[in-house]
Amino acid sequence: MKRTFQPSTIKRARTHGFRARMATKNGRAVLSRRRAKGRKRLAI
């Protein structure tokens, strides 16, 4: 059985990156929540 986590920086950025978050309404909500919480890093 292969391991489920096969790291790829491109895939990571495209699904969890800042521009991906900004693309949808819910993604922007995620960023605003993280800003409100005071996260040092908003996205990957």
From Swiss-Prot:
Keywords: Ribonucleoprotein, Ribosomal protein. It comes from Pseudomonas putida (strain ATCC 47054 / DSM 6125 / CFBP 8728 / NCIMB 11950 / KT2440). NCBIfam families: rpmH_bact. PROSITE patterns: RIBOSOMAL_L34 (PS00784). GO terms for cellular component: ribonucleoprotein complex; ribosome. The lineage of its organism: Bacteria, Pseudomonadati, Pseudomonadota, Gammaproteobacteria, Pseudomonadales. InterPro entries: Ribosomal_bL34 (IPR000271), Ribosomal_bL34_CS (IPR020939). GO terms for biological process: translation. GO terms for molecular function: structural constituent of ribosome. It comes from the Bacteria. Belongs to the bacterial ribosomal protein bL34 family. Transmembrane segments: none annotated. This is Large ribosomal subunit protein bL34.
